[in-house]
């Protein structure tokens, strides 16, 4: 690497880290204070939803993705809001009824969860959608089943993700179809990612999955699409363009960006 490349890398890293990380409090000793309550024993909690009974937080424990680090496995966890303790959910494998029949999973296959979403389906069941990066790029579907002191996960199917997409987050509809945010190319380098974080060019867009097909949502292009949240009743989806430094309100009927913040 040349001296100029090194200088550029350091400058880009400093700029991006200042924008996205900011000041951090040392919580390595897992001690709370009068401003911050620290709950220990969780590993890389990435995305969080509250369970239907409002008694637990369910979360994905992120493994890792490129270009920041090597892809590796993670898992899932529940936080009991009353006892402040961690619970590892039980997972069982059943018939694939909510995914692509060509996609399969075995009991011993590891998980690499990223973005998640939980919705009450039209049939009354609770469906959890998971963006999964390990060992393969898939969308995993689970039914959440209430138990006495926890929630269990029943695998109900998956969808293989084509190489052209690299997903971050998912928003489910009540009929089992969904939207997902495509971040950027899978083979993006760290230098390229840092450069985009400075110049804010478009890298990805929103994808809709229905009729067992992925389809781009026109007009949703932006820099680093990240977290998304769907209001199905109004056909509005909120998109966090991470590298673009904005949260955008997007109309799914007109395929137009209505408003943005930051």
For each of these PLM feature ranges, what is it?
Residues 19-44, 98-102, 152-153:
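A short helix->beta-strand "capping" segment at the edge of beta-propeller domains
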Residues 37-75:
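Beta-strand-rich domains and repeat architectures in extracellular enzymes and scaffolds
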Residues 42-52, 95-120, 155, 160-178, ...:
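Beta-rich, blade/repeat-based domains predominating
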């Amino acid at each position: 690497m040349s001296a100029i490349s090194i200088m550029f890398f350091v400058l880009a890293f400093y700029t991006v880290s200042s924008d996205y990380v900011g000041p951090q409090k040392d919580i390595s000793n897992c001690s709370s204070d009068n401003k911050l309550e620290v709950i220990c024993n969780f590993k890389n909690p990435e995305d969080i939803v509250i369970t239907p009974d409002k008694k637990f937080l369910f979360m994905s424990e992120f493994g890792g993705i490129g270009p920041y680090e090597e892809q590796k496995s993670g898992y899932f966890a529940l936080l009991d809001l009353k006892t402040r303790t961690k619970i590892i959910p039980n997972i069982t494998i059943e018939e694939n009824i909510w995914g692509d029949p060509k996609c399969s999973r075995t009991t011993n296959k590891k998980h690499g969860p990223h973005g998640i979403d939980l919705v009450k389906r039209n049939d009354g069941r609770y469906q959890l959608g998971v963006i999964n990066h390990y060992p393969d790029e898939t969308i995993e579907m689970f039914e959440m089943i209430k138990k006495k002191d926890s929630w269990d996960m029943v695998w109900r199917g998956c969808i293989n993700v084509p190489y052209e997409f690299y997903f971050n987050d998912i928003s489910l509809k009540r009929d089992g179809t969904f939207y997902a945010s495509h971040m950027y190319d899978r083979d993006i380098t760290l230098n390229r990612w840092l450069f985009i974080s400075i110049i804010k060019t478009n890298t990805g867009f929103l994808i809709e999955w229905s009729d067992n097909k992925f389809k781009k949502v026109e007009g949703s292009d932006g820099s680093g699409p990240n977290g998304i949240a769907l209001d199905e009743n109004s056909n509005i989806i909120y998109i966090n363009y991470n590298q673009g430094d904005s949260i955008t309100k997007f109309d799914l009927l007109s395929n137009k960006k209505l408003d943005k913040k930051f």
